[in-house]
């Protein structure tokens, strides 16, 4: 039996298991769920999958998705027009 495990690695080094592989450069929430685009607002915590590594051993593989925290300013390009938050205001 071959076992595949998938993890997200937060910028501070914490690791959390996720149910499956995440595409490179995808936006995800704190639980590793892919965010639907366009985003409703830029006032949210979102990460970008910045790097992916896979470690294979006999009978198993571990895939690590390294995340990068996105700023509110960076998220503006992913938001519906007309509903953005800048400096804490809509």
Model-derived features: positions:
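Mixed-charge, Lys/Arg-rich low-complexity intrinsically disordered regions
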Residues: 1-24
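Short, solvent-exposed secondary-structure boundary/capping segments
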Residues: 55-70
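Intrinsically disordered, low-complexity, charged/polar segments
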Residues: 2-8, 68-90
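Short beta-strand-centered aromatic/proline hotspots
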Residues: 39-55
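Acidic surface patches and DE-rich sequence motifs
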Residues: 10, 29, 55-57
